[in-house]
Curated annotation (Swiss-Prot):
It holds the Pfam family zf-C3HC4_4. GO terms for molecular function: zinc ion binding. Its main location: cytoplasm. This is Ret finger protein-like 4A. It is found in: Cytoplasm; Nucleus. One of its GO terms (cellular component) is cytoplasm. It comes from the Eukaryota. Interacts with PSMB1, UBE2A and CCNB1. Expressed in the ovaries and oocytes (at protein level). Expression restricted to gonads. In testis, present at later stages of spermatogeneis and abundant in elongating spermatids. A zinc finger (RING-type) spans 11-53. It comes from Mus musculus. Transmembrane segments: none annotated. Residues 78-278 form the B30.2/SPRY domain. InterPro entries: B30.2/SPRY, B30.2/SPRY_sf, Butyrophylin_SPRY, ConA-like_dom_sf, PRY, RDM_domain_RFPL, SPRY/PRY_RFPL, SPRY_dom.
Length: 287
């Protein structure tokens, strides 16, 4: 998938990596030096877009400084991206046995008997007081605690309209409203209204995701300081966070929909066990 990063950072005209990128009036992107090679307008006071023939005068041309900075970063990270994004075939050998940690579950979350599935209910659950428990945000952590190595797990999101999954620092403050962002110690992807997918960068990165997404693979590589997300319906890459810190242990993070009817089977999040990955139904006999 790394070729997609390279493709998006190429000049539309010379097809090489963008250098000092500029926008024409119509949105066409090319290198600053490629402007001299574009066809001139009949009047001679502008250039023609090679795609749509819209004329751009000198004052219409905008220097894309932010895009240029992004392209530079992509070029610098390309070796690491190539390494990470070609590991999908071998990720499953790092799959870990994991359950949900009930002692961290916010009291409006129902956890199944097998500790693999979770959904939200308006009815508050009677649980013991725990310093580890989330409040007020509807979140729960996985039982695993990661300090080194490579780890992989799969989460069934089904047709849920709202969810967030990924990893967080173990040291996050669980006793206040959660704001998902890297700077707050969260590396997650999620969806709102079943159509707006995003990664918890700051600001959020909107993602283009297959609408048939039902199961997500998560690969944490503490050697490469990255965590990547994969659409298991077609094996496509969703997003990778790079240069994650390694100063704190990480925990798997789950937050199901909290704004849909109680017991709605579509809103369940489930961890796939190592021996039998698959879709799980609604939790029964909740804890």
């Amino acid at each position: 998938m790394a070729h997609l990063f390279k493709e998006k950072s190429n000049c539309y005209f010379c097809f090489r990596c963008l250098e000092s990128p500029v926008y024409l009036n119509c949105g066409y992107i090319c290198c600053l030096k490629c402007l001299d090679s574009l066809e001139k307008s009949p009047e001679g006071d502008g250039v023609l877009c090679p795609t749509c023939s819209v004329v751009s005068l000198k004052e219409d041309i905008i220097h894309a400084k932010q895009l240029g900075a992004l392209v530079t970063k992509i070029k610098n990270l390309e070796p690491q991206l190539n390494f990470i994004l070609t590991m999908d075939q071998g990720m499953k050998i790092f799959q870990v046995t994991m359950t949900l940690d009930v002692d961290t579950a916010q009291n409006h979350l129902i956890i199944s008997d097998d500790l693999l599935s979770v959904y939200y209910t308006p009815q508050k659950q009677a649980r013991k007081k725990c310093a580890e428990r989330f409040h007020p945000s509807p979140c729960v952590l996985g039982s695993s605690r990661f300090t080194s190595g490579r780890h992989y797990w799969e989460v069934v999101v089904g047709t849920s309209k709202e969810w967030d999954i990924g990893i967080c620092k173990e040291s996050i403050n669980r006793k206040k409203a959660i704001h998902l962002s890297e700077k707050n110690g969260f590396w997650t992807v999620g969806v709102r209204a079943k159509k707006v997918y995003s990664a918890s960068t700051d600001p959020l990165t909107v993602l283009r995701v297959n609408p048939r997404l039902r199961r997500v693979g998560i690969f944490l590589d503490m050697l490469e300081k990255s965590v990547s997300f994969w659409d298991l319906s077609d094996g496509s890459h969703i997003y990778t966070f790079l240069e994650i810190p390694d100063t704190d242990p990480f925990r798997p993070f789950f937050s199901p929909a909290s704004s849909y009817p109680d017991g709605d089977q579509e809103q369940v999040l489930s961890i796939c066990p190592v021996t039998n990955p698959g879709i799980f139904g609604i939790p029964v006999n909740p804890q």
